[in-house]
Amino acid sequence: MNPVNTKPYQLSADATWFVTGCSTGIGRAIASHVASQPGHRLIATARDPSSLSYLDDDNPAILKLAMDVTNPSSVNAAFKAAADYFGDKYYIDVVVNNAGYSLSGDTESVTEHEMHDEFETNFFGTVRVTLKAIEVMRQSKDHRGGLIFNISSLAGICAFPGHAFYHASKFAVEGWSESVAREMHPDWNIHFCIVEPSAVKTNFETTSKKRTQPHEAYAGADMPARQLETFVKKGLEAGVGFEPSAVANVLYKVASRNEKVPLRLPLSATAVKLITAKLQVQLQDLETVSELSAIDVHQVQFKV
């Protein structure tokens, strides 16, 4: 396989950050953290720019933009506005693709409109912003490169009942990001990091979650999705999770520590534990089906 992130990443002292979904939660925490760093510039985006009022209007290093990641014209306009605003100083060093929401409910009841909207925001929105950023980064004459954080989730690795299309969108982010990371020429110095947080204390389970109409066939309390809902509700009531500022601190550390960037970054002990458990089960499953899988054992095989 083509290696990724082969060199240490060095964050410029005057780095420009482009962050999506800055109205609340992780995006807001990252924007606030970047805004507090001397010398750094921030391009903070949200569908409603009035939600960015927490950022200083009088700081020339901060640009607040309206951007809808589901609209290609809106994304293109945001990048052009940033280039026009910063002029000769325009560059994008770090991108944080954070805009997204969860669609939960019984899979049989999800409408075509709901499933497409989920992918437009979580997956295609990430794609649009990433491609525009790569275009800027790979054309730098001094191989300045850049770093792209794509916010996935524990849900991009481990799938749970009642969130099929949310999982599908995050699995898509994971696979697409890894593939694109392997397409980058080492000389471009473009790094990727897929971020996989678990329970963050945001409005993700409230205003950032959309629910489908319930399906009567799945209404029973003994159904897996209903049991998970009960479990999650108890966790929220107990205050389970970590603050968005913790995510912001870690991402800034990854960007600024002058070391190799991890392709995947699970956030929380719970995420590491559940991902480890899934990988162990997958290895066991591979052993179980190894005899069935070896259909090419007597043929020429690719060397990996």
UniProtKB/Swiss-Prot annotation:
Lineage, top-rank taxon, reads Eukaryota
What the entry lists under InterPro entries is as follows: NAD(P)-bd_dom_sf, SDR_fam, SDR_oxidoreductase
Where, by residue number, is the active site?
152, 166, 170
Biotech: how is it used?
Answer: Calbistrin A has been reported to possess a number of interesting bioactivities including antifungal active against Candida albicans and cytotoxic toward both healthy and leukemic human cells.
Annotated metabolic or biological route of this protein = Secondary metabolite biosynthesis
Q: Name one Pfam family in it.
A: adh_short
Q: What is its EC number?
A: 1.-.-.-
Q: Name one GO molecular function term.
A: oxidoreductase activity
Answer yes or no on keyword rRNA processing: no
Broad EC category = oxidoreductase
- Presence of the UniProt keyword Oxidoreductase in the record: yes
Up-regulation conditions: Expression is induced in complex medium (Czapek yeast autolysate medium) supporting calbistrin production.
Q: Could you tell me the keywords of this UniProt record?
A: NADP, Oxidoreductase
Q: Where does NADP(+) bind?
A: 26, 45, 68, 98, 166, 170, 200, 202
Q: Which family does it belong to?
A: Belongs to the short-chain dehydrogenases/reductases (SDR) family.
Q: Any idea what job this protein has?
A: Oxidoreductase; part of the gene cluster that mediates the biosynthesis of calbistrin A and related compounds. Calbistrin A is a secondary metabolite with an interesting structure that was recently found to have bioactivity against leukemia cells. It consists of two polyketides linked by an ester bond: a bicyclic decalin containing polyketide and a linear 12 carbon dioic acid structure. The polyketide synthase calA is probably responsible for forming the decalin moiety.
- Any idea what this protein is called? Oxidoreductase calM
Per the UniProt record, the lineage of the source organism begins with:
Eukaryota, Fungi, Dikarya, Ascomycota, Pezizomycotina
